[in-house]
Each structure stands twice: as C-alpha cells, then as structure tokens.
Amino acid sequence: MEIFHSIQGEGFHSGTPHVFVRFGNCNLRCDWCDTDFLTFDEQSIDSIVDQVISYDCDRVIFTGGEPAMQDLSPIGKRLKHHGISLSIETNGTMPIDPVIDWICVSPKDQLYPNVSIKQRLGDELKVVYCGQDMSMYDDLKEGFTHHFIQPCYIDSDTVEQNGKSFQIVEKIVKESPGWRLSLQMHKWMGIL
C-alpha cells in the first residue's frame, strides 16, 4: 500500500486534491495500469488513518490494484469520523462497501470477457477505450450518473499509437453526447 497527496487526474473529480490510498493487490492485470505491484507494504489501520489525516485534505480515493479486495469498512469509518469523504476507483468485479461515498467503476470486461461486473450502480462509469464496441456499456450506463471515456494510454507505445486512440475517443465523444472525455492529467503533468 502507498499513501500520497496529489491531484485527481481522471474523471469527474479531475483537478481536485485528494489523498490516495493505493492498494497493491488486484484480481486483473491491465497493460496500462499505473500501479507498481511490487513495492507495497502492509500497514495497520491506525497508521493509514494517521497518514491520511496528516495531509489536511477532506477527500480520499481508495485505488489500486483493486481496493474492493480489502475490507474498507474499518478504515472508512475511522476516516469518516474525521470528516473525510471516501471515493473508490474499482474494476466493478466485487460489491462495494456502503461506507464509500463516491463509486467510480472502470470496467475491464473488454479485456476479460469471462469477468462479470457486479457493481452496476454508482456515481461514475469510466471506460478505458481499447478498441471495444462501446455499445457493450449501454445497459451498464443506466446505473451511473456520470459517464467518462478515457483513451488507453500505454507508456511503451509510440506517440502515433497513443494518438490514434485519442482520435477515436474524440470521435466517440462527439458522436455520443452521453460520454465525456477523461484524460489522465496526472501523467501529462508528471505527477502521481
């Protein structure tokens, strides 16, 4: 696990400061994931809470890896006691603890056809576009208030390869007004 204070670079809360609590475990492995799965240490709930409140920020994002693999209730209740709003970025393959205030599901079923999305309700649906048919999300969209599409950006790809993904996403957003563009601003800014 790692804990750090930064600017949310994706989706609805893009541009706002948050404390990120990033867990290392995940039930999937996506090429574009920006999580380093090798450098995580386990921490006590007290240690996590102390680190989070030291940043004097009232917003936390549980991310990963897959944060829903953790029991977030004890940590979440303690943080809420300090007036902190809790968000989660999840692949949606596991139900989310009710202690969470904001649910962002970023489904990966375009890469893992045998994986089913269990968390079908939430605040934000954020799809990473990898060439899939966007109609596969028509039913899922109904359970979410905000719908974002994000071009797949792979650090090892060429500018041309990543640029092609950006152009396709631009076209999708123009032709499908129910989708809004999400870019990974933190990568452009060179921050976590």
Where do the PLM segments sit?
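Bulky hydrophobic/aromatic packing residues
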Residues: 11-13, 51, 56, 102, ...
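Flexible, acidic/Gly-rich N-terminal and inter-domain linker regions that tether
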Residues: 1-20, 29-32, 175, 180, ...
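Conserved Radical SAM active-site core
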Residues: 1-3, 17-23, 29-101
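Residue-level signal for well-ordered alpha-helical segments
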Residues: 3, 7-10, 44, 56, ...
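Conserved AdoMet/S-adenosylmethionine-binding subsite of the radical SAM
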Residues: 68-192
